[in-house]
Amino acid sequence: MTRSIKKGPFVDAHLQKKVDEQNEKGTHNVIKTWSRRSMITPDFIGHTFAVHDGRKHVPVFVTESMVGHKLGEFAPTKTFKGHVKDDKKARR
């Protein structure tokens, strides 16, 4: 289910505070965050977030097409290493 419109988007208060401070100063420094659940709002456009994926912080540059999605969608938590080829010749 999606979130109710009357509630509005969820953004962690500390993250919104950092974005507001940078918008006032006119700077666009990287904002390190562990808040993967925060929704991207229009005032995040042009900022770069370092979103934690459980191991490291992945840089995510926010564009217009990302508005309405969550930060965690752009920092995958699992790395796919590929399927191992099961071949008799490879074992020799």
UniProtKB/Swiss-Prot annotation:
Which Pfam families does the entry link to?
Ribosomal_S19 (PF00203)
Q: Where are the transmembrane segments?
A: none
Lineage, broadest ranks: Bacteria, Bacillati, Actinomycetota, Actinomycetes, Bifidobacteriales
The cross-references to NCBIfam families, in alphabetical order and at most eight, read:
rpsS_bact (TIGR01050)
Q: Which InterPro entries match?
A: Ribosomal_uS19 (IPR002222), Ribosomal_uS19_bac-type (IPR005732), Ribosomal_uS19_CS (IPR020934), Ribosomal_uS19_SF (IPR023575)
Which superkingdom is the protein from? Bacteria
The set of disulfide-linked cysteines is none
Q: What does this protein do?
A: Protein S19 forms a complex with S13 that binds strongly to the 16S ribosomal RNA.
* Any one annotated GO CC term: cytoplasm
Which Gene Ontology terms describe the biological processes this protein takes part in?
ribosomal small subunit assembly; translation
* Protein family according to the UniProt entry: Belongs to the universal ribosomal protein uS19 family.
What HAMAP family would the database entry show?
Answer: Ribosomal_uS19
Q: Is Cell membrane one of the keywords UniProt gives this record?
A: no
Record's protein name = Small ribosomal subunit protein uS19
Listed Gene3D superfamilies: 30s Ribosomal Protein S19, Chain A
Gene Ontology molecular function, alphabetical: rRNA binding; structural constituent of ribosome
**Keyword set, alphabetical order:** Ribonucleoprotein, Ribosomal protein, RNA-binding, rRNA-binding
Keyword RNA-binding listed? The answer is yes
- Per the UniProt record, the source organism is Bifidobacterium adolescentis (strain ATCC 15703 / DSM 20083 / NCTC 11814 / E194a)
